[in-house]
Amino acid sequence: MSPLKIHGPIRIRSMQTGITKWKEGSFEIVEKENKVSLVVHYNTGGIPRIFQLSHNIKNVVLRPSGAKQSRLMLTLQDNSFLSIDKVPSKDAEEMRLFLDAVHQNRLPAAMKPSQGSGSFGAILGSRTSQKETSRQLSYSDNQASAKRGSLETKDDIPFRKVLGNPGRGSIKTVAGSGIARTIPSLTSTSTPLRSGLLENRTEKRKRMISTGSELNEDYPKENDSSSNNKAMTDPSRKYLTSSREKQLSLKQSEENRTSGLLPLQSSSFYGSRAGSKEHSSGGTNLDRTNVSSQTPSAKRSLGFLPQPVPLSVKKLRCNQDYTGWNKPRVPLSSHQQQQLQGFSNLGNTCYMNAILQSLFSLQSFANDLLKQGIPWKKIPLNALIRRFAHLLVKKDICNSETKKDLLKKVKNAISATAERFSGYMQNDAHEFLSQCLDQLKEDMEKLNKTWKTEPVSGEENSPDISATRAYTCPVITNLEFEVQHSIICKACGEIIPKREQFNDLSIDLPRRKKPLPPRSIQDSLDLFFRAEELEYSCEKCGGKCALVRHKFNRLPRVLILHLKRYSFNVALSLNNKIGQQVIIPRYLTLSSHCTENTKPPFTLGWSAHMAISRPLKASQMVNSCITSPSTPSKKFTFKSKSSLALCLDSDSEDELKRSVALSQRLCEMLGNEQQQEDLEKDSKLCPIEPDKSELENSGFDRMSEEELLAAVLEISKRDASPSLSHEDDDKPTSSPDTGFAEDDIQEMPENPDTMETEKPKTITELDPASFTEITKDCDENKENKTPEGSQGEVDWLQQYDMEREREEQELQQALAQSLQEQEAWEQKEDDDLKRATELSLQEFNNSFVDALGSDEDSGNEDVFDMEYTEAEAEELKRNAETGNLPHSYRLISVVSHIGSTSSSGHYISDVYDIKKQAWFTYNDLEVSKIQEAAVQSDRDRSGYIFFYMHKEIFDELLETEKNSQSLSTEVGKTTRQAL
């Protein structure tokens, strides 16, 4: 099997389509216009998917999958992931080597395999037409006899034996993969030959049209450094050359070109190769000609070839742009530095930037959020989890303006729930973190609640679907932990357990004693879990005193610790920041706070087993939940705060009064025979959209004021949302609360007020004489229907026209007033932003000098210090550097508050990047590299929130990343050695 077309089960994952199922198909490499692409074909048919590979490969991984089979996994720059399984190991290895060569930009246009280069030729065919090649070959035959007389036939025989082998099209005797067999013969002369390309443009065009057999024969002879041509018969020296010989050959070629004796000098330089061509072998190497691989000497066909065709000019231009292997490349560090860009400060939003950078650095958290196939189009546009994920995906690949816009959307999503974050005043980073995590959990709960009840067509018999349909909440699997509080009666020993879930722990600063060294985060954590006495009435014995112990019942992957760096001054009624020095250890241990029943953190594979990876079908990518005729319509649980806003405008109070008046007048014209019966029907059918006839024939005159108001609201709500016929039941409705755009910046749907698709009951029996149908829309943009068959038709129309004119006048006045209020509000907001920014800068500058605090600080006055034995203290000290104790956690991020007061200052974040295996400081938009020791020493007085990852989870992630990088490095070395 050709290594450039491999077959097996294929799975694709991307942000647009989610994760697809395994389907039989093939990967095929196609080269076109100096670009290499991967074409995915499925055996079931359909349109092939094409992925560009040139400058787009992020990682290539090959893993064993059964006996003599492998799985090839390809990651692109946009985090798209392609896998093909059950591929023969040999073919998979050759494909991997080729992809790595493309990844490392070591497969330029001038060196791509052609039809004669082994097994790659069937796919990356030649660019020269067969007709042109045949013309070249026939020309070579005609010229061979004329040149034999002047050539040295002594060296011709062994060379012809090597190149005349019919099997030379794929030189299978050379060790290595398909790439190693093809590229070495081209790279040996690429460097000196490039210098001759800029000398004579006409000559280069003509040299391009020479045959592939001429080119292949020129390479060994040009590198010949002996008179008896030993290099032609020695395989180990066949593709090696002396740099000095190349330079001499190049110099001689330039002298020949300037002397004008091109045909004669060319023939004497290359010996008798032209006369010894065997076209039976040369015919299998079509279009091996390329500008970057041409020799600098003039070709023998100078006076006989026709004028260059446009195809040759096009080829020349493409290859001339490529400068070859020795082109100075931009160092990898510069690319990383370009990607390392922080978040813009929108106006005192440093607290948000610091928290987001710390959360985004949690690799397991990001994987659980992005890689389980969450149907983003099912989630409302303004939901935090959607805004959060969009920013996480785009933060390293979009420009600063787009990133700033995404940041605003994240802030607005949180401000919609917590108004204290809506302005531009300073806020506490821990409060923002708590709000963010709680809101993400709520969004996931709402998604799972809707997802469980939604039917999925065509998946009833699928073995991949388990009984529980649920997506994994990244907050629960990574950050949430459970603590069991045991209340023990000191009189009778009765134990009352109570469990509580936390996303983080707020720990106190221990009171510092002068002779002792500074306390550490470990001390504060142990202080939190110490046993304490409290007054408690025992139900069993009536005792009044109890002891409370706290133990971990379930551990998190990442433990977040919030250090209370503030104290309340009762006299001044102010919160003061505590600048006490606190040692930040590399490792923490929770072993003394765990029991034998304590559950370990969720493993990294837990999410994949528990979450249902449901591929997004075309029907699931619309902008709303689909309403099925066989099942009731389900409302998405993300609802608006005010249900009245669904059908009424903000200034619709007068309209409501008029609707009530019209309804009362209508009741006087209606009969009273079926009023009670219709009222009962209306109360029974309240979950379903009632008929117009039922609502309008209801006994309005017998209703109370509240009941009448509710009935009129029901009519207005029904008329405000357009109903669909039975023919449109299968068509989804568009809504901003249920749509997911591909880039979150799209046009709003047509019906923004429609929350769900409602089907009106079919009206089977209507008596035009018994009632009059009145329809009034809330937006007042539609024409009102006039009643038919009523006695007061003329009076009603006149009164309605007068009311309509009055309403229009009131609407204009309200609109003008609203615009004035909006302008005033915007002006006030701008003033608040400027004032807050100036105040923040002033307070920050005034407090920066005192940011380090004082050694006189003694921590919180009501908190005692922990007492350890000498052995315990020594053990904790060793564990702080090694993490050898059970249940140890490793420091991965610190959020620091710079400033002397708790009401003002600036937040920064230090995070450990597992992929780069280095620490970085994020100061809003600025990013800088920092050493871990500097983080521990520089943040000992300003560290506010600390992120610690479970050591086993950290080691597993780090090992996976190292293996991935070492695999790429090995592949690069192997490829370079082969070249």
Swiss-Prot record:
Compositional bias per record (Basic and acidic residues), positions renumbered to this chain: 243-257, 681-695, 719-732, 774-786
BP GO terms, sorted: cell division; G1/S transition of mitotic cell cycle; protein deubiquitination; protein K11-linked deubiquitination; protein K48-linked deubiquitination; proteolysis; regulation of DNA replication; regulation of protein stability
Modification Phosphoserine, positions: S114, S170, S210, S628, S650, S652, S770
All residue ranges annotated as the UIM domain in the record: 704-723, 806-825, 828-847
Name of the encoding gene: USP37
Lineage: Eukaryota, Metazoa, Chordata, Craniata, Vertebrata
Catalytic residues in the record: C350, H906
Compositional bias of kind Low complexity: 183-198
Subcellular location: Nucleus; Chromosome
Tissue: Expressed in brain and prostate.
Name of the featured protein: Ubiquitin carboxyl-terminal hydrolase 37
Inducing factors: Induced by E2F transcription factors in G1.
Domain of life: Eukaryota
Regions crossing the membrane: none
Motif D-box 1, residue range(s) on this chain: 71-79
Predominant subcellular localization, coarse grouping: nucleus
Motif D-box 2 location, chain numbering: 96-105
Keywords: Cell cycle, Cell division, Chromosome, Hydrolase, Mitosis, Nucleus, Phosphoprotein, Protease, Repeat, Thiol protease, Ubl conjugation, Ubl conjugation pathway
Record's subunit section: Interacts with FZR1/CDH1. Interacts with CDT1.
